[in-house]
């Protein structure tokens, strides 16, 4: 079990990242790379090589496309690739609203819930019946500390977070209660 400090300062990078990394095939790592590529301020296409194809990663690609990102997966290549085509972004999340279905993908639910909180609009996430039993309250509570974010669970403390944002996020200190 990890022990984290009560406060963790996250500083913006001084310059854009220009690197190549080889990572093990993993749906969780592929989904993290997809979110990072979608949010990256890039002025060229971004290609993820060796992405793991799974239900979770296909769900994430479809959700990002629904959010307005120009993504083209090629799952049949010798090394599967996912290309993000450059598009001038006027918004962090291109779509002002979206209904996202994450099937049974817990990583997609959590990553997308946090990701859409950076956008300006209204986003609703749903999944299969089993997803509605999985807890997400800790994440919703953390997101509700952000100025302008309203993250709610439509049923119990389960899934269905509807996230509404009306203005840009402001810098500040946000905390997570110890477990």
Language model region names:
Residues 1-179:
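Structural preference for solvent-exposed beta-strand-turn elements
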